[in-house]
Curated annotation (Swiss-Prot):
<dbReference type="GO" id="GO:0003735">
    <property type="term" value="F:structural constituent of ribosome"/>
</dbReference>
<keyword id="KW-0687">Ribonucleoprotein</keyword>
<protein>
    <recommendedName>
        <fullName>Large ribosomal subunit protein bL19</fullName>
    </recommendedName>
</protein>
<dbReference type="InterPro" id="IPR008991">
    <property type="entry name" value="Translation_prot_SH3-like_sf"/>
</dbReference>
<comment type="function">
    <text>This protein is located at the 30S-50S ribosomal subunit interface and may play a role in the structure and function of the aminoacyl-tRNA binding site.</text>
</comment>
<comment type="similarity">
    <text>Belongs to the bacterial ribosomal protein bL19 family.</text>
</comment>
<dbReference type="InterPro" id="IPR018257">
    <property type="entry name" value="Ribosomal_bL19_CS"/>
</dbReference>
<dbReference type="GO" id="GO:0022625">
    <property type="term" value="C:cytosolic large ribosomal subunit"/>
</dbReference>
<dbReference type="InterPro" id="IPR001857">
    <property type="entry name" value="Ribosomal_bL19"/>
</dbReference>
<dbReference type="InterPro" id="IPR038657">
    <property type="entry name" value="Ribosomal_bL19_sf"/>
</dbReference>
<dbReference type="GO" id="GO:0006412">
    <property type="term" value="P:translation"/>
</dbReference>
<keyword id="KW-0689">Ribosomal protein</keyword>
<dbReference type="Pfam" id="PF01245">
    <property type="entry name" value="Ribosomal_L19"/>
</dbReference>
Length: 179
């Protein structure tokens, strides 16, 4: 392995540590959550369509997603390791016999449909993804609960300190009156 491949592998591992992408192939319907910056505000926009191609390799790997928007075909190419991609969800598995589905560009309506894959591989991948998503949601929920508890404890400590300060101030105000 030469130096460039080694550096690319390290970068890919670093990006995969932050977010993991599910296993998907051409023919699968995917929902890509993309970060969109409008002025100073950044939001996440979902782009859902059929993956018609995967190309490249290593850090330069990308995939093409096609959808029909208002009767017009729209294709978008996403680099797999782009920081603008927040997540990719597989909506359904497609059963195709080609690696590149460019023939869908010429088709409309029912002829452009892709049969859903209900085989063992698809079920296994879907079950694994559902388990991973459920685990991720549970982890996020646990973090939220821990943060809420820490915030409540911090607020209670601040309220107790405030009450103590008020009691000391009242005691100090009562002392000169007693003299």
């Amino acid at each position: 392995m030469n130096i460039i491949q080694q550096l690319e592998a390290e970068q890919a591992a670093k990006i995969e540590a932050k977010r993991t992408l599910p296993e998907f192939s051409p023919g699968d319907t995917v929902r890509v959550n993309v970060k969109v910056t409008e002025g100073t505000r950044t939001r996440v926009q979902a782009y859902e369509g059929v993956c018609i191609a995967r190309s490249g390799g290593g850090l330069q790997e990308n995939f093409t997603v096609r959808k029909i928007s208002y009767g017009e075909g729209v294709e978008r190419v996403f680099p797999i390791y782009s920081p603008m991609i927040e997540s990719v969800d597989v909506v359904r598995r497609g059963k195709v016999r080609r690696a590149k589905l460019y023939y869908l560009r010429d088709r409309r309506g029912k002829s452009a449909r892709i049969v859903e894959d209900t085989g063992v591989r698809a079920r296994k991948l879907n079950d694994a993804e559902r388990a991973a998503i459920a685990e991720e949601k549970a982890r996020i929920e646990a973090e939220k609960v821990a943060a809420a508890q820490a915030l409540a404890a911090e607020k209670a400590a601040a309220d107790a300190a405030e009450a103590k300060a008020a009691a000391e101030a009242a005691a100090a105000a009562a002392e000169p009156a007693a003299e």
